[in-house]
Structure formats: C-alpha cells, structure tokens
Amino acid sequence: MCSKRFCTLILLGVMVIVSSMSAWSLRLEKIKYGDFSNWVTRSITESSVLGGKTKKVYEIAPTQSIVGNKPYRNQGGSPWATSNVYAKVVGIVKASNTVSPFDRGGGNKCVKMSAMMEEVKVLGVINMDVMVQGTIFLGQINEPITSTKTPYSKMEMGIPYTKRPVALVFDYKVDMPATNTRIKSTGFGTPKTLQGRDCAEVYCLLQRRWEDKDGNIYAKRVGTGRERYYKSTGWINGHELRIHYGDITSKPFYKSWMGLLTGDKAPYAKNSRGKMVPVNEVGWDAPNATPTHVMVMASCASGVPFVGTEGLTLYFDNVAFGF
C-alpha cells in the first residue's frame, strides 16, 4: 500500500494531466474564418474637409482588396463583422479602423483589437477626439454609419445556431496599459477621465428568439459563457470559455455583467420585415432548451460605447465551439 504522501502526489499528478488535456478532449467545430488568416483590405478616401486621406480598413473574409467608398456586407460566407466602419454623416465621409490582422510569427495571422482616440479635424474649425474600441462579433454591420446615436442599432448581432456546445475555445493575449483610468470621449464636449481601467472581454451567448405579430423580437437566454480580462497576459492557447445552461444567477461564478441583455444593453437584429429592432431577453430558458441563435463577441473594451483605456489591446485566434 502506498504512503499517504505518495498517493497524494500521484493524485495531484493525475489532476494536472487531466487539466492540461481538457482542451484536447473536446471535439472542436471551427467557426468559419475563425483562424483569421484571410482579410479583406478596403481603401476608403475620407472627405476633403477631413484631409482627404485614403485609409485602410480591414474585414474578416476571403482575401481581396476593395477600393472605393462602398458599404460593406459580409463576403464569401464569412459570419464575422468588425467595429471597423465607413461612416457618412451629412455627406462627410470618415473611416475608422480598430481591428486589424496581426502576425503571431511565421505568417500565422490573428486578429488584433485596440482601443484608441480617433481624431476628427475639419479644416481647423472642428477638432475633436472620439474613443473607439476594437470589437469583432458574429453578425453584420449596416453601412454606411450615418450617426453616433444608439450604436447597437447599427450592429446585427447573432447568427442562426441550434447546437449546444460546452465551451467556446480560442487563443488569446492581452496587452494592458499601466494605468488605472478610462477615457470617455463621444466627440461632443471635453473628454473625461474616469477612475478604474477598462477590461477586454469575450462572450458566447446562446438565445432562443421569437418575433411577435408587431415585429418585436424577444429572446430567452439558453446558455452563457462570458469572461473579462483585467491584466496583461502572454499567449494562452486552447483556452476554454465554459458555457453554462439555464438560469445561472444563483451560481457562485455569476457576475452582474453576465445577466440578461435588455434596454440599452439589448443587441439588435432584423425582423421579418427587414427592420432593425432590439432583441430584449425576457428570461432564462430551461437548462435543456434548444437555442435558435448564438452571439459570439470579442472586444478590447467592456461594452460601454465611447469609453475605453487607450492602448488596451486584445489578440484573438483559432475560435471554435467545443463539444
């Protein structure tokens, strides 16, 4: 019979092995273009009153170049949208790029999302800064953007999906600036410095959606996986974001920001009439419910428009559902 100390060491060794193998034990279903090896490069020329520069703006889809100020729709069956946008407000064209390809080494690309101040100058008359944050998600952006009001209403979030994965699996890395502040800057008024740094975030939310006779869309939350990252890391490969089914509000890991999305936090989707409407979550679904849609999002910010920690960067790669 082994000694108590020896048995304990063996047990610990087995636990370490099992823990290190957990990502490999899942069957992975890759999300299309989720290795971020393919990118569309758009060349958008801003209005002459803004200087008339041509900016590079990137999208996640089969490799190609698009020249000209053209609204973008997802190409080649790509399910990914980005916070990179072509805006045309009262006839003035502006481009913004906070999401771009990044070489991990040897030509192995990932996606890089950064928080930065976007400068807007109009012939020396207007000089303002807007805090913009890099974000990618499953869905569509409706271009051109014509106003800064209700940002979520420009984002068609979520795609049809009926499976029940146990995890979202991905590689990630965080660069967190050595500061404990955030900047709020909408472009109107003086930028404000807020105490407390922002954080990067990844979520995978499963919903069961339906539409009423008036075209309103509602949902119940089927599954929840949501994490926030508050400090710098090296590359963490094969990370598992576990998805928990049913009502999680009584679970020890539950945080308020994992809650239901309603009101100004509600995502938007097109209803059967082609109108963008909010998708209000009205409750938690049964633990064995089948979803109709999945929302996957990764961002270098925690979801408040025009608020961020400048320089905070999230790198993201090799995204898959784990079963």
Language model region names:
Residues 1-30:
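Bacterial Sec-dependent N-terminal signal peptides
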Residues 15-19, 133, 172:
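N-terminal non-cleavable signal-anchor helices
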Residues 26-165, 195-246, 257-322:
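Aromatic (Trp/Tyr/Phe) and Gly/Pro-enriched flexible surface segments
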Residues 164-174:
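A short beta-strand element within beta-rich, extracytoplasmic domains
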Residues 174-181, 192-197:
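Extended, low-complexity, turn-rich repeat/linker tracts enriched in Gly/Pro/Ser/Thr and Asp/Glu
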Residues 180, 249-257:
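Substrate-binding/catalytic groove segments of enzymes
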Residues 180-185, 214-217:
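A short secondary-structure junction signal
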Residues 186-192:
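Short, conserved, GDST-rich strand-edge loop motifs in beta-rich repeat architectures
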